[in-house]
């Protein structure tokens, strides 16, 4: 076993960790074996040094090895998630996109937690709607099979996350756990759209996904946002057959108008709930609908639907039908049986 002191000394010298060192470090983290002051120092050192794809992949393996097992789902399983920490406090686009994608016929396993750095995290929103976020894994699997949608609450699957919550809150900034969050979904989706909070993270995240053996993925950075943008260009690293292809898309590539970031501003969970409810009922603002649609359109590309404009139009029609709220309502009802 590698000593914690030797790992910390390397980080204080801004040296990269080996696979084994990073695995051991995050095993210590998730088992509550690192005291709070040292946790904050380690997370700060990692951030200043900049995390490598090897450090991220080994941390993912350590965290998944300490997570409750989720029953395997037959066929393709999608994930739409952002790292958070982009600082813009937009409405919950990835959560809404997951509900819309499920309505469109894609099985989506949404993994996440309550807010750390924004006003309203994905599971704050879901709780405000009345979703029981602590379903047993077999019940969540059945919900996925019935309604194409399952919510996996991170602290329920990995109780060790309680050991790191305080350090993350104290730091009030994004840390490696923002990067790890999208990668440690216990349902292990094979088709994922992951939004990152920095352009510098696109390639390390993509390389990490290749190292983890993910089938198809798109890592996106939307000019400041951790999702596909409607205010400016979006940088993409797409993964297929372990190959990474980088490109940039604009709102016009999706066939939509360009909007301002302020058009997507969120608020407290109650305010966000009302905004999201209107979108799901087919009564949302054009900017809100567009933001959700382009993210689902990018997911559809991972299913060999390459025409982003056509994908976006299909999704907008589904949104405007109001059927998406029915999907959420079915999940709410099922989760409270």
Swiss-Prot record:
Positions that bind Mg(2+) 2: 226-227
Name by which UniProt lists this protein: Anthranilate phosphoribosyltransferase
Alphabetically ordered keywords of this record: Amino-acid biosynthesis, Aromatic amino acid biosynthesis, Glycosyltransferase, Magnesium, Metal-binding, Transferase, Tryptophan biosynthesis
Family matches, as InterPro entries: Anthranilate_Pribosyl_Tfrase, Glycosyl_Trfase_fam3, Glycosyl_Trfase_fam3_N_dom, Glycosyl_Trfase_fam3_N_dom_sf, Nuc_phospho_transferase
Keyword Nucleotide-binding attached: no
Species of origin: Francisella tularensis subsp. novicida (strain U112)
Gene: trpD
EC supergroup of this enzyme: transferase
Cofactors that this protein relies on: Mg(2+)
């Amino acid at each position: 076993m590698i000593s914690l002191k030797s790992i910390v000394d390397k980080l204080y010298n801004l040296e990269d960790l080996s696979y084994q060192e990073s695995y051991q470090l995050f095993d210590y983290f998730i088992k509550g074996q690192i005291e709070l002051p040292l946790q904050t120092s380690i997370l700060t050192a990692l951030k200043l040094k900049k995390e490598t794809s090897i450090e991220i992949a080994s941390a993912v393996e350590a965290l998944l090895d300490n997570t409750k097992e989720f029953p395997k789902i037959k066929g393709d399983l999608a994930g739409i998630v952002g790292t958070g920490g982009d600082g813009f406090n937009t409405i919950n686009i990835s959560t809404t996109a997951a509900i819309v994608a499920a309505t469109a016929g894609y099985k989506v396993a949404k993994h996440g937690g309550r807010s750390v750095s924004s006003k309203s995290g994905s599971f704050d929103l879901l709780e405000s709607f009345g979703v029981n976020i602590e379903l047993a894994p077999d019940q969540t699997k059945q919900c996925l099979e019935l309604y194409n949608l399952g919510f996996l609450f991170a602290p329920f699957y990995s109780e060790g996350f309680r050991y790191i919550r305080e350090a993350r809150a104290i730091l009030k900034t994004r840390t490696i756990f923002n990067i790890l969050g999208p990668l440690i979904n216990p349902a292990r989706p094979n088709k994922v759209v992951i939004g990152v909070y920095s352009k510098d993270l696109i390639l390390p995240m993509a390389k990490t996904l290749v190292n983890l053996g993910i089938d198809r993925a798109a890592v996106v950075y939307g000019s400041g946002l951790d999702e596909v943008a409607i205010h400016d260009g979006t940088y993409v690293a797409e993964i297929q057959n372990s190959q990474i292809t980088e490109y940039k898309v604009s709102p016009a590539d999706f066939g939509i108008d360009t909007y301002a970031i302020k058009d997507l501003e969120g608020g407290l969970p109650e305010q966000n709930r009302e905004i999201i409810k209107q979108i799901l009922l087919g009564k949302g603002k054009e900017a809100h609908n567009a933001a959700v649609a382009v993210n689902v359109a990018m997911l559809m590309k991972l299913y060999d639907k390459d025409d982003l404009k056509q994908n976006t139009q299909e999704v907008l029609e589904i949104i405007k039908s109001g059927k998406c709220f029915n999907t959420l309502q079915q999940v709410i009802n099922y989760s409270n049986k």
